[in-house]
């Protein structure tokens, strides 16, 4: 292969998009990621006598270190002393050992090819710090020995996935909702607006609703058998007998999985500001919990997601200075230069798994059209397929890494060896 050309069609670059909720990875040039598994991983620390539990599907960390259980199947098996942890905090890598375990697992189980053969394009949070970027670059070159590397901001990749190089990316994921202005493929740092009202917040609201309605949350791992019961009558189920002593963090994770299913099946955003009378007229949705308890949900379906758009009616948020989704967008545009605002309003791109709640985009479109200055043309871009919206930054990375014109952008191993880890600041905006 000729000296300096990496990537290209024949080498197959890998694209990693590691979010707070799931990890997405696969080959550049394909239309969707090969793998999509939870970022949360199970961790069992060795006992004092050095014995661990059965080693079947665990990935052993360093000698004497913890054992990691990664991927849906391994994570959801109840095990004694297994904590559910996440390597990320605020979208940035916090725990490097478990982060490395995720990469090891992906290479071993899914890529099934030598790390040293594939250039890697990785997505990163727009607010990622210099120290973390350099550490990541060092890890990829030194530990995985990859031939070339590139780091790109998630918002820029989302814009590319939608065929734009300028636009305002509204990304609502698990941990936060952010508006990120992108101009000519660069993130405008001063215009980033973040709000903690996102998927995890909705999960929390659902939890409170279940407590109020006295609905017991029983994750499937505890259930040995259940009987069909009438709507609204108490559940009739048998508990599994030999359950190990699970940790609270893992049990919580399993409960959240149940709630997330409920979120996707039941919730809907109201077309206009939430109104008791209108909500009462809404058709109800029937939902059955894993333990067999089932009932209809009416007004609650609209009330819970309302907090995303109108945080003032959420009880328990003290002082409440948080911004609703449409405010996040308008505030962000307002912080950018006046000349580029038309370009931002002209392509507001919606991305992230949390935006898949029914009618989310309709409500956003309606609120933004009321707030957009009359001189601006508003255009909301939202893919209607779940795949494209959940994986938008991965798809953008897949497009970018397979472009012929991108091939001179890679940080090659040679450049890394000559310039050290500082070259990531110079080559990856």
From Swiss-Prot:
The source organism is: Homo sapiens (Human)
Q: Tell me the name of the encoding gene.
A: ACTL6A
Q: Which CDD domains match?
A: ASKHA_NBD_Arp4_ACTL6-like
Keywords (A to Z) from UniProt: Acetylation, Activator, Chromatin regulator, Disease variant, DNA damage, DNA recombination, DNA repair, Growth regulation, Intellectual disability, Isopeptide bond, Neurogenesis, Nucleus, Phosphoprotein, Transcription, Transcription regulation, Ubl conjugation
Q: What name does the UniProt record give this protein?
A: Actin-like protein 6A
Q: Where N-acetylserine occurs along the chain? A: 2
Q: Which residues carry this modification: Phosphoserine?
A: 86, 233
Record location of the Glycyl lysine isopeptide (Lys-Gly) (interchain with G-Cter in SUMO2) cross-link: 62
* SUPFAM superfamilies, per database record: Actin-like ATPase domain (SSF53067)
Sequence similarity: Belongs to the actin family.
């Amino acid at each position: 292969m000729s000296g300096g050309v990496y990537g290209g069609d024949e080498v197959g670059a890998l694209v990693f998009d590691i979010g707070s909720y799931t990890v997405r990875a696969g080959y550049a040039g394909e239309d969707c990621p090969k793998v999509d598994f939870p970022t949360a991983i199970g961790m069992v620390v060795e006992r004092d006598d050095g014995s661990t539990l059965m080693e079947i599907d665990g990935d052993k960390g360093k000698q004497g270190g913890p054992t990691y259980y990664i991927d849906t199947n391994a994570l959801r098996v109840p095990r004694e002393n297994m904590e559910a942890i996440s390597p990320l905090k605020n979208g940035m890598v916090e725990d490097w050992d478990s982060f490395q375990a995720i990469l090891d697992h992906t290479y071993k189980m899914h890529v099934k090819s030598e790390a040293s053969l594939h250039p890697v394009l990785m997505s990163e949070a727009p607010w990622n710090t210099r120290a973390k970027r350099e550490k990541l670059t060092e890890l990829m070159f030194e530990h995985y020995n990859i031939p070339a590397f590139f780091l790109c901001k998630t918002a820029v990749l989302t814009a590319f996935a939608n065929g734009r190089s300028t636009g305002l990316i509204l990304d609502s994921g698990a941990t936060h909702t952010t508006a990120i202005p992108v101009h000519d493929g660069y993130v405008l740092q001063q215009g980033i607006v973040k709000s903690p009202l996102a998927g995890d917040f909705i999960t929390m609201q659902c939890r409170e609703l279940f407590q109020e309605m006295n609905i017991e949350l029983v994750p499937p791992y505890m259930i040995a058998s259940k009987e069909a019961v009438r709507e609204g009558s108490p559940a009739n189920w048998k508990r599994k007998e030999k359950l190990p002593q699970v940790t609270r963090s893992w049990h919580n994770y399993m409960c959240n999985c149940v709630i997330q299913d409920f979120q996707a099946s039941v919730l809907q955003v109201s077309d206009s500001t939430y109104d008791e009378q209108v909500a009462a007229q809404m058709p109800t949705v029937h939902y059955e919990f894993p333990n067999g308890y089932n009932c209809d949900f009416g007004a609650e379906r609209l009330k819970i997601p309302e907090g995303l758009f109108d945080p003032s009616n959420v009880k328990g948020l003290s002082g409440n200075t948080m911004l609703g989704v449409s405010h996040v967008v308008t505030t962000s545009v307002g912080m950018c230069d006046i000349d580029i605002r038309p370009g931002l309003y002209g392509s507001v791109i919606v991305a992230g798994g949390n935006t898949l709640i029914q009618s989310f985009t309709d409500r956003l479109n309606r609120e933004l059209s009321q707030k957009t200055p009359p001189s601006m043309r508003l255009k909301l871009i939202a893919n209607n397929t779940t795949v494209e919206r959940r994986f938008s930054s991965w798809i953008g990375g897949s497009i970018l890494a397979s472009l012929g014109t991108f091939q001179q952008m890679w940080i090659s191993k040679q450049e890394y060896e000559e310039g050290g880890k500082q070259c990531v600041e110079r080559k990856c905006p």
